C-alpha cells in the first residue's frame, strides 16, 4: 500500500517544489510509482514518475538523513 498523499512536496536536495498527482503501478512489474509535476519550468519534462520506495526514502544531506521529499501542504 502506498502512503504518499497528493499535495505539494519539496525536494530536500534540490529545493524544487512538485505536485504529487497520484500513484500508479508499473505496467510490467506492478511496482508502485509516484506521478508528480514540477512546479517550475523544467526543460526536460514537467511530469515525472519515480518508484514509491525511492520517493519515500531517506537521503543524506550535510551528514543528516532526511526524507527525499517533504510534504509542504496536502491537496
Task: Please tell me what each predicted stretch does.
Residues 1-75:
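Mixed-charge, low-complexity intrinsically disordered regions
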Amino acid at each position: 500500500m502506498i502512503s504518499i498523499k497528493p499535495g505539494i512536496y519539496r525536494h530536500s536536495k534540490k529545493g524544487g517544489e512538485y505536485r504529487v498527482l497520484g500513484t500508479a503501478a508499473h505496467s510490467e512489474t506492478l511496482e508502485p510509482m509516484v506521478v508528480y509535476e514540477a512546479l517550475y519550468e523544467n526543460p526536460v519534462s514537467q511530469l515525472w514518475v519515480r518508484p514509491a520506495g525511492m520517493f519515500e526514502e531517506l537521503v543524506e544531506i550535510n551528514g543528516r538523513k532526511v526524507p527525499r521529499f517533504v510534504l509542504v501542504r496536502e491537496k
